[in-house]
From Swiss-Prot:
InterPro entries: bL21-like (IPR028909), bL21-like_sf (IPR036164), Ribosomal_bL21 (IPR001787). The keyword rRNA-binding applies. One of its GO terms (biological process) is translation. This is Large ribosomal subunit protein bL21.
């Protein structure tokens, strides 16, 4: 069974026991989270498509850890001005393991 969920402004195709790196969630490692914004749920070629979400469907996941992504450098240089600026940024992420996909009843 698979599902397509929406979280953090992105969509992810998930199945049971998948490990995902998603945008940061304000939860403690070891907690359980439930994603109710399920866009598609199905098994094999049989799928239920929501408009926009599938009613009654949810995906449960366990928070594994919080980490940070690779550093992204934003560098600006103005030629012949002896002017340059470098700024770094690391995005915060949450790693989750999908435990259960619950279809609509």
């Amino acid at each position: 069974m698979f599902a397509v969920i929406k979280t953090g402004g992105k969509q992810y195709r998930v199945a049971a026991n998948d490990v995902l790196t998603i945008e940061k969630l304000e939860v403690v490692a070891g907690d359980t989270v439930e994603f109710t914004e399920v866009l598609v749920i199905g098994e094999g070629a049989d799928a239920a498509i929501g408009a926009p979400f599938v009613k009654g469907a949810s995906v449960k996941a366990e928070v594994v850890e919080h980490n940070r992504g690779k550093k992204v450098i934003a560098f600006k240089k103005r030629r012949r001005q002896n002017s340059k600026r470098s700024r770094g940024h690391r995005q915060h992420h949450t790693v989750v393991r999908i435990t259960d996909i619950v279809a609509a009843k």
